[in-house]
Amino acid sequence: MLERHDTLECLNQTSPLREKLVKTHMVLNNHLPFIKRIAVAIYDPKTSVLKTYLHSSGKEDPLSHYQTTIKDTPSLEALMKQGNPRIIKNKVTVERGRHEHTQRIGREGYAASYTLPMFYNGVFFGFIFFNSSETDAFNETTLEQLDLYGHLISLMVINEINSVQTLVAAISTASHMTHLRDPETGSHLDRMSRYARLIAKSLAEQYQLDDEYIERVFMFSPLHDIGKLGIPDQILLKPGKLTEEEQTIMRTHATKGREMIDNMLANFGFDSIPDVDILRNIAQFHHESINGQGYPAGLSGNSIPLEARIVAVADVFDALTSRRPYK
């Protein structure tokens, strides 16, 4: 019996999505060595914003931490509406592009590009970009191969995003029950999650954060107080100051949140979702303090997970800058 090594076996493993994209690019380069970059941008339908998400570049990517509204990029908006791919055949077209993202790509020396829109059951998710070092590289044979790899990458990305969204939806449903008891508004959670994303982006260079991490913080941050489901109403809804004993019970919501998330991950079979520890850390450690006086573990400084620090700042910032009459 002949044995053969599966060149894409990493796609069946729980490695981060970017590692899977890099490996896929390496396999593609065995056939199309002039493809020097594969990148994925995802679409936020609430804000009509297109955000960089993944790239296969071994170096610093020219479009890391970049976003734009779909209406500000008419050619991409047309692809979204029509569902068709786009070919830019030569460097002149790239260099003359008026949009910042096109100019950045041109300055990196990429000479041509092929863009595929991502759809799942008719719902638009974003784009896949194949950038070439050679002009006029996209003949029919090449395009057939890129279509195959593009759909593979699309399924890989959408499958992971759907898994994360299902997890977030499940926990959000439980979290909504909390907000029926504790009147934390959905607008507050939406604002603070976007503040968290802005903070993470501003720290990206200092902490070498990639777009995938930033998106996880954005998606998971509204779930920080899920543990309040385990707090009795007479404490959670008490209008006056809590007693010392009541404060002790209230502070257990951080640990309870971590326990609830662990149970949901196990029950839904989502333990293997990459970066799920970001969610665990946000729920458990968002009340820690830089000086070590927080809870539940009394962590201090850099021992507090970065995502928990980001969410804590975003939460407090919104509380201080928004009128919330129930507070």
Predicted features along the sequence, with ranges:
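Helix-loop-beta substructure at the N-terminus of cytosolic sensory domains
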Residues: 11-53, 61-64, 199-213
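Short beta-strand-to-loop transition segments that serve as allosteric relay/switch motifs
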Residues: 58, 126-137, 239
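Regulatory sensory and allosteric helical modules in signal-transduction proteins
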Residues: 60-103
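Signal-transducing coupling segments at domain and membrane junctions
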Residues: 89-112, 289-299
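A short, aliphatic-rich beta-strand micro-motif
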Residues: 111-119
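Amphipathic alpha-helical "output/dimerization" segments
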Residues: 120, 137-158, 215, 306
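Histidine- and acidic-residue-rich, metal-dependent catalytic cores
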Residues: 169-327
